[in-house]
C-alpha cells in the first residue's frame, strides 16, 4: 500500500497539460498503449480526473489484409459484430416460427451483403464515436505503432514511417490479443481466415469449416448455420474447456441437432486451393488415424488467441512476460515488473479475456493512480455468456471447479430441464434448455455458481450475478419471487438436486 500511495502521489503531483521534454519529446502524465475497451476506459477516466493523457493505437492488418479503426477487438471484430450477426441468425428462426403464430411470412433467402454492410457501418460509427470521446476529454490520439525505448519513453511509428517520442510518469499496456494461426499446417496462413476477417467479408463465406473448440469457434459456427450456411466445426479434443463440461456438452448437442456438423477428435493437416477457388482440407481422425478430406469455400481458424506483445520491445523497459503464454505478468494492482508500468485486459496474465473486466480494471487503475480510490479489481464471480444458437450464460464456479475446491460431499447441485413458453406454439425442440445451480451443501447453502442454457441467457445471468457476488444463498434465491411467465423464473424454482436422482424435467405451468 505504501508503494501504491507513493505512485499515486507522484502521479497527482504532475501538472496537467505538461510541456515537451528534451529533443522535442512529448511529455504526458499517462500513456496508454492500445485503443481497445480497457485502454480507452483507462485513458478517458484519467483525463476526466485532470491528467494529461495520450493513447497510442495501431492495427496491424490481418494476414488476409483486413484492417479496422479505433476501439479494439470488441468493437471491430468481436462482441459487437458477433452479437449483431447472432441476432440476424435468431431472426431467421423467428421467421420460421411466425406462421405458427398466425403471420403469413414468406421464407426469404438471407442476404449476407446487406447484413455485412449494416454491421460494418455500425462499427464505423463506433470508431468515430471513440475518436470524438477522446477529443472531448482532451486525450491526444496517436495512430502509431508503439515500442519502448526505455522505462519512461515510447517511440510511436506512423504508417508513413514518421517517428514520435513520448514520455510519461505512468504507462499502461492494453494491446489485447489476436487470433492464433496454426502455422505448422500447410496452407493455413495463405488460405484461412479468422474472426479478424469474418465480420468484414463483403460476400458470404459460403460452405465453411470452423476449426477450434473455443467459444469463438462455436459462436461463429452457430451464427453461420443460423444464416443458412453449410457449416462444420472441427474439434480436436474438448469443447469450451474453460466452462462447465455438462453445459458445454449440451451446447454442442444442440448445435449438432440443429444443422451444424461437428467433427470430433479430428485435426487438420493441410489446406490447398482448388482450381475453382474452393479449398480442400485434409484432416486426420485422432482415434483411428484415418485420413479424410472435404471441400469448403472458407476455412476459419478459431484455435485461441495470442497477446500483442511481440513488437513492444518490452525488454527495453524490463517488463516481464510469461515465457509460455507471452502475456505480461501483473500483480493485483495491475502492476508489471516495472513499478510505473501496468497491463490490463487480454494482454495481462491470468485475467479473463472479457471486455467488461478490462473496462472496469482500466477505470479503477486510473482512479488509483489519481488517488481517488484504493479499490482493486475483483476478478471473482465474473458473469459471461457464450452466444451460441442456444445461449449459455454463467457466473461463478463450474460444477467441476466446485467439487475440486470443496469436495464432492460438500457440494449440492440443483438443476432443471425446462421449456420456454415461446417454444411451445411452434413446437421447438427444448431438450437442451437447462439450468444448474452449484451450491455448498451446508445450510444456508451459499451459491457457488449458476449456469443457464436457453434464450436470452446473458440477460438472465446479469441479474443473478449481483446476488451471487453479494453472497446469495440457495435459500434466499428460493424465496425470491419470479416474474411470470419467463425463463428466468425457473432459476427461483430449482427444487431437484442431482443427489436425489429425481427427474429434473419441469412439468406443468402456473403452479
From Swiss-Prot:
Sites of the Cysteinyl-selenocysteine (Cys-Sec) crosslink: 509-510
Regulation: Inhibited by 1-chloro-2,4-dinitrobenzene and by zinc, calcium, magnesium and Fe(2+) ions.
Binding site for FAD: 29-58
pH dependence: Optimum pH is 7.5.
Catalytic-site annotation from UniProt: 484 (proton acceptor)
Cofactor(s) needed for function: FAD
Biological-process GO terms, alphabetical: cell redox homeostasis; response to oxygen radical
Cell location: Mitochondrion
Record-linked Gene3D superfamilies: 3.30.390.30, FAD/NAD(P)-binding domain
Disulphide-bonded residues: 74-79
Catalytic reaction list: [thioredoxin]-dithiol + NADP(+) = [thioredoxin]-disulfide + NADPH + H(+)
Keyword entries, A-Z: Disulfide bond, FAD, Flavoprotein, Mitochondrion, NADP, Oxidoreductase, Redox-active center, Selenocysteine, Transit peptide
GO cellular component annotations of the record: cytoplasm; cytosol; mitochondrion
Function in brief: Involved in the control of reactive oxygen species levels and the regulation of mitochondrial redox homeostasis. Maintains thioredoxin in a reduced state. May play a role in redox-regulated cell signaling.
Additional remarks: The active site is a redox-active disulfide bond. The selenocysteine residue is also essential for catalytic activity.
Protein family according to the UniProt entry: Belongs to the class-I pyridine nucleotide-disulfide oxidoreductase family.
Protein name as annotated: Thioredoxin reductase 2, mitochondrial
Organism classification: Eukaryota, Metazoa, Chordata, Craniata, Vertebrata
Amino acid at each position: 500500500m505504501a508503494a501504491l500511495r507513493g505512485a499515486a502521489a507522484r502521479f497527482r503531483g504532475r501538472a496537467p497539460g505538461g510541456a515537451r521534454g528534451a529533443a522535442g519529446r512529448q511529455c504526458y502524465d499517462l500513456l496508454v498503449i492500445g485503443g481497445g475497451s480497457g485502454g480507452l476506459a483507462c485513458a478517458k477516466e484519467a483525463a476526466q480526473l485532470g491528467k494529461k493523457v495520450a493513447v497510442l493505437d495501431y492495427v496491424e492488418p490481418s494476414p488476409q489484409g483486413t484492417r479496422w479503426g479505433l476501439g479494439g477487438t470488441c468493437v471491430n471484430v468481436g462482441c459487437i459484430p458477433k452479437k449483431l450477426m447472432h441476432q440476424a441468425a435468431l431472426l431467421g428462426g423467428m421467421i420460421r416460427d411466425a406462421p405458427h403464430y398466425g403471420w403469413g411470412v414468406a421464407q426469404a433467402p438471407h442476404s449476407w451483403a446487406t447484413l455485412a454492410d449494416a454491421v460494418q457501418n455500425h462499427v464505423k460509427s463506433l470508431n468515430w464515436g471513440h475518436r470524438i470521446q477522446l477529443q472531448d476529454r482532451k486525450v491526444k490520439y496517436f495512430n502509431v505503432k508503439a515500442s519502448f525505448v526505455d522505462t519512461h519513453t515510447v517511440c510511436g511509428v506512423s504508417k508513413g514511417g514518421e517517428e514520435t517520442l513520448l514520455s510519461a510518469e505512468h504507462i499502461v499496456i492494453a494491446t489485447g490479443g489476436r487470433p492464433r494461426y496454426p502455422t505448422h499446417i500447410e496452407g493455413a496462413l495463405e488460405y484461412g481466415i479468422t474472426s479478424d476477417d469474418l465480420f468484414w467479408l463483403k460476400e458470404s463465406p459460403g460452405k465453411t469449416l470452423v476449426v477450434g473448440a473455443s467459444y469463438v469457434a462455436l459462436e461463429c459456427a452457430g451464427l453461420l448455420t443460423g444464416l443458412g450456411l453449410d457449416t462444420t466445426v472441427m474439434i480436436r479434443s474438448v469443447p469450451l474447456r474453460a466452462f462447465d463440461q455438462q453445459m458445454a456438452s449440451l451446447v454442442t448437442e444442440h448445435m449438432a441437432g440443429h444443422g451444424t456438423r461437428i467433427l470430433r477428435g479430428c485435426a487438420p493437416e493441410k489446406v490447398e486451393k482448388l482450381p475453382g477457388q474452393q479449398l480442400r482440407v485434409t484432416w486426420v481422425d485422432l482415434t483411428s488415424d484415418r485420413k479424410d478430406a472435404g471441400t469448403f469455400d472458407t476455412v476459419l481458424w478459431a484455435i485461441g488467441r495470442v497477446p500483442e506483445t511481440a513488437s513492444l520491445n518490452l525488454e527495453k523497459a524490463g517488463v516481464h512476460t510469461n515465457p509460455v503464454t507471452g502475456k505480461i505478468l501483473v500483480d493485483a494492482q495491475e502492476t508489471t515488473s516495472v513499478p510505473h508500468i501496468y497491463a490490463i485486459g487480454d494482454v495481462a496474465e491470468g485475467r479473463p479475456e472479457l471486455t467488461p473486466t478490462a473496462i472496469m480494471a482500466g477505470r479503477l487503475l486510473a482512479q488509483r493512480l489519481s488517488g481517488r480510490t484504493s479499490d482493486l479489481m475483483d476478478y471473482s464471480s465474473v458473469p459471461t455468456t457464450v452466444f451460441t444458437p442456444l445461449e449459455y450464460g454463467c457466473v461463478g464456479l463450474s460444477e467441476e471447479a466446485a467439487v475440486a475446491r470443496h469436495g464432492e460431499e460438500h457440494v449440492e447441485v440443483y438443476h432443471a430441464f425446462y421449456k420456454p413458453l415461446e417454444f411451445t406454439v411452434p413446437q421447438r425442440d427444448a431438450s437442451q434448455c437447462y439450468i444448474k445451480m452449484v451450491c455448498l451443501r451446508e445450510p444456508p447453502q451459499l451459491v457457488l455458481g449458476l449456469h443457464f442454457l436457453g434464450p436470452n441467457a446473458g440477460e438472465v445471468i446479469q441479474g443473478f450475478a449481483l446476488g451471487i457476488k453479494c453472497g446469495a444463498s440457495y435459500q434466499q434465491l428460493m424465496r425470491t419471487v419470479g416474474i411470470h411467465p419467463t425463463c428466468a423464473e425457473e432459476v427461483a424454482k430449482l427444487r431437484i438436486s442431482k443427489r436425489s436422482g429425481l427427474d429434473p424435467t419441469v412439468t406443468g405451468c402456473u403452479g
